[in-house]
Structure formats: C-alpha cells, structure tokens
Amino acid sequence: MFPSPALTPTPFSVKDILNLEQQQRSLASGDLSARLEATLAPASCMLAAFKPEAYSGPEAAASGLAELRAEMGPAPSPPKCSPAFPAAPTFYPGAYGDPDPAKDPRADKKELCALQKAVELDKAETDGAERPRARRRRKPRVLFSQAQVYELERRFKQQRYLSAPERDQLASVLKLTSTQVKIWFQNRRYKCKRQRQDQTLELLGPPPPPARRIAVPVLVRDGKPCLGDPAAYAPAYGVGLNAYGYNAYPYPSYGGAACSPGYSCAAYPAAPPAAQPPAASANSNFVNFGVGDLNTVQSPGMPQGNSGVSTLHGIRAW
C-alpha cells in the first residue's frame, strides 16, 4: 500500500474557516475601537470647551469606551473589499483657547454695533468740519478812488481795448494790479453794450402818447369871483318850463289886489282853464327865462322893500 500523503492545510477546511471568522472579529473590534476613539475625542473636546467641569480626563473616557464595547457585543465582520475608515483628526481642548463661559454672544454683538455707530458719528463730524474749510472765500470788492475812476474813464474814451504792456503801464500809474484794470475795462465795455441795446429798444418801440390838456375855467381870482359875461353862462343854466308842463300867463291877466306890505296877499279869482295854444303860434304865452332873471322879476304892485319874496306869479303850482 502507498503511504498516506501528508495532510496539507487547505483554506477551505473547517478550522481555517473558524480561524478566519475569529480573525475578522478581532479586526472588526479594532476598527470599532478606533472609530469610537475618533468620535469621542471631538465630543470630549467640545464638552471641555463649554463645560470644563464635566471633563474628567482620559480615565473616564476609557471606562466609558469599555462599557460601550460590552453593551454592543461583537460587531459584524465587514467585507474584505471595504476600505478602512480614515481616522478623524484629534482635537485638543487647549488648542484654540478656552472661551469665557460667562460672556454672552449678544453682548459682543451690541458692543460691535456701538463701535460702528461711534465710528460713523466721528466720520460725519469730521466731514462736516472739513466742508466749511473747503469752501472758497470770496475776495473783497475793490473800491476805486475818484482819481482812479477819472483816469480809467479818460483812457477808456481814447482806447477801449488795451494790450498787456499798456495794462501794466496803466496799472503801475494808478497803483493797481493788471487784473484789476483788465476787469474794469471788461465791465465798462459790457455797460456800454447794455446802454446801446436800451437805446435801440427805445427807438424801435412805439412813441409815448402825448399829454392830454384839459381846459379848466377859472372861477376865483385874487379872492374875487370871475364869472365873466353872464350871457356866456345863461345857456348852461337855462330852464325850459315847457318840458315840465308849466303854463306861465302874463301878469295883467290876474285881476286881484297886490300883496300887502305884511306879506299877506288878497285872494285872486280862479284862473281860467288852461288852453293849450298851438306850438307854432308866435303869440305863445310860455316863458323861458334864466336863473339870473329870477331875482329881477317883481310884481308892479309889490313894494320894493319886499323884493326878497318870490315874484314868479306866472308859474302855476301843481
């Protein structure tokens, strides 16, 4: 008989399969511990940053890790093709400085706003203080003396435009600057131009209306009335009795006694009915007389002492 060949280990035997499972479990537990340490390190860093009294050092973290492993038990074996998880960076509590737990972020924001407002106010004040300084001050107006004005006017009548040397010479004579002489000549030429324009407008414009003359009669001269010829004023004061329907009859038609000196008149008989004579009759009894003749008409039977009484006996009252 042939000797039995030596038993060579095959990767597919029961022992190899069991050993492979154990190796995978050990690798998985190592990866899990690395991942837990990586996740717990940032947590402990944050805890130490905000609550430093709760942080008790690496011993507490190790005990918590052991308890977590015991509770979770063996982890499932990951596949062989899966890459290993990269280790997360470890944070140290003192790397970035410990913030003050008593300080409120709202207070920081308020302080920042207050600083910004103060800076803006300072900038506005500086701008307001600089603006008046930047404004250019106007130079005072130059006042020429009478002798200077007279000499400038005389030179302007001779020559309206001056060259630079002539300006300098005139300025030195009058004790002025060349710029002052130049500006004076410019203003004088502009003034002459405006005067010519005004004269042209006056010539082209319509002529003004002539003054109206009104004749006013002189009524009083040297304290005495100067009426002149009364005949000239008679037409203005003429009274036409025909327009008012008054019928004037001749005085002899009344057959009664005259008035007594005591202003008592006798009764006159009733006047005859008014007969309307023809308008074109030459013997018309209507009378037209002026106001100036009223005082001269007197009754023949009335005494002269009673001349102040009205003597219009020919006017019939309504």
Swiss-Prot record:
It comes from the Eukaryota. GO terms for molecular function: chromatin binding; DNA binding; DNA-binding transcription activator activity, RNA polymerase II-specific; DNA-binding transcription factor activity; DNA-binding transcription factor activity, RNA polymerase II-specific; protein homodimerization activity; RNA polymerase II cis-regulatory region sequence-specific DNA binding; RNA polymerase II-specific DNA-binding transcription factor binding. The keyword DNA-binding applies. Predominantly in the adult and embryonic heart, and to a lesser extent in lingual muscle, spleen and stomach. Homodimer (via the homeobox); binds DNA as homodimer. Interacts (via the homeobox) with TBX5 (via the T-box); this complex binds DNA. Interacts with HIPK1 and HIPK2, but not HIPK3. Interacts with the C-terminal zinc finger of GATA4 through its homeobox domain. Also interacts with JARID2 which represses its ability to activate transcription of ANF. Interacts with FBLIM1. Interacts with TBX18. Interacts with histone methyltransferase NSD2 (via HMG box). Interacts with NEDD9. Interacts with TBX1. Keywords: Developmental protein, DNA-binding, Homeobox, Nucleus. The keyword Cell inner membrane does not apply. It is found in: Nucleus. GO terms for cellular component: cytoplasm; cytosol; Nkx-2.5 complex; nucleoplasm; nucleus; protein-DNA complex; transcription regulator complex. Disulfide bonds: none annotated. Its main location: nucleus. The gene is Nkx2-5. The homeobox domain binds to double-stranded DNA. One of its GO terms (biological process) is negative regulation of canonical Wnt signaling pathway. This is Homeobox protein Nkx-2.5. Residues 137-196 bind DNA.
